[in-house]
């Protein structure tokens, strides 16, 4: 019989008018004449109270009217209230904080890309000068004259004149046919000067570094050309 009585009391005390009548009985005044302090209690009862607010309300009532009665808050507050909105709010906040922590961990674990193979190959050739430039170009074919003209940004006539003067080299050897097909890794040299005292020749060099598998809409080849505009090399490497 005690449990149904507690439930009935709990349901009744949740209504604001019940608190009004209860306060009138305790104060010995009419329920319509509310004192200033009652406004605070009415505010608590008309809003969504949590457990701590209910305990505070009971404690204030008993301390005002019955100060000699020392009752533990657990005694005059035998029931508990589960506030779903507060629980959901705490869960949502916890998930948000966990998500932010995961994103920070992901950012810290992100590794930076390693150096390209081109840079590694260049460092493995200590005798090759570093004053080069990599260019992405589009070519119709892999003919020697086409690759050299595109890489050096020179006219076709200049390439033909250099060919007839014997100033073109392919991998250090004299070029005998300007329409010869080149492949990745081949070097194309155009001799621009000679130093007899040092036994060196100055060349403009093109290296076919890479060929992309995907072609353009016009069915042309996309390539990467490495260009040296002025490179000094021993003459013997060009005069085989």
UniProtKB/Swiss-Prot annotation:
Residues 92-127 are annotated as: Disordered. Residues 142-217 form the S4 RNA-binding domain. It is found in: Mitochondrion matrix. It comes from the Eukaryota. GO terms for biological process: regulation of mitochondrial transcription; rescue of stalled ribosome. This is Mitochondrial transcription rescue factor 1. Its main location: mitochondrion. One of its GO terms (molecular function) is RNA binding. The lineage of its organism: Eukaryota, Metazoa, Chordata, Craniata, Vertebrata.
């Amino acid at each position: 019989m005690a449990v149904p009585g507690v439930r009935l009391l709990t349901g009744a005390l949740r209504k604001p008018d019940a608190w009004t009548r209860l306060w009138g009985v305790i104060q010995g005044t009419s329920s319509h004449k509310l004192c200033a302090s009652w406004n605070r209690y009415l505010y608590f009862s008309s809003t969504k109270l949590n457990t701590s607010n209910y305990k505070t309300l009971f404690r204030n009532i008993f301390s005002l009217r019955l100060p000699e009665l020392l009752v533990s808050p657990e005694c005059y507050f035998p029931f508990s209230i589960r506030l779903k909105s507060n629980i959901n709010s705490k869960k949502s906040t916890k998930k948000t904080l966990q998500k932010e922590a995961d994103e920070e961990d992901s950012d810290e674990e992100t590794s930076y890309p390693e150096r390209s193979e081109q840079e590694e190959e260049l460092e493995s050739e200590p005798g090759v000068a570093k004053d080069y430039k990599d260019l992405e170009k589009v070519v119709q074919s892999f003919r020697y004259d086409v690759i050299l003209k595109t890489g050096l940004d020179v006219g076709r006539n200049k390439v033909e004149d250099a060919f007839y003067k014997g100033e073109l080299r392919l991998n250090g050897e004299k070029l005998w046919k300007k329409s010869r097909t080149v492949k990745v890794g081949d070097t194309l040299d155009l001799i621009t000067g000679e130093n007899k005292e040092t036994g060196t020749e100055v060349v403009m060099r093109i290296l076919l570094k890479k060929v992309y598998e995907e072609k353009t809409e016009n069915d042309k080849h996309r390539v990467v050309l490495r260009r040296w505009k002025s490179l000094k090399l021993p003459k013997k490497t060009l005069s085989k």
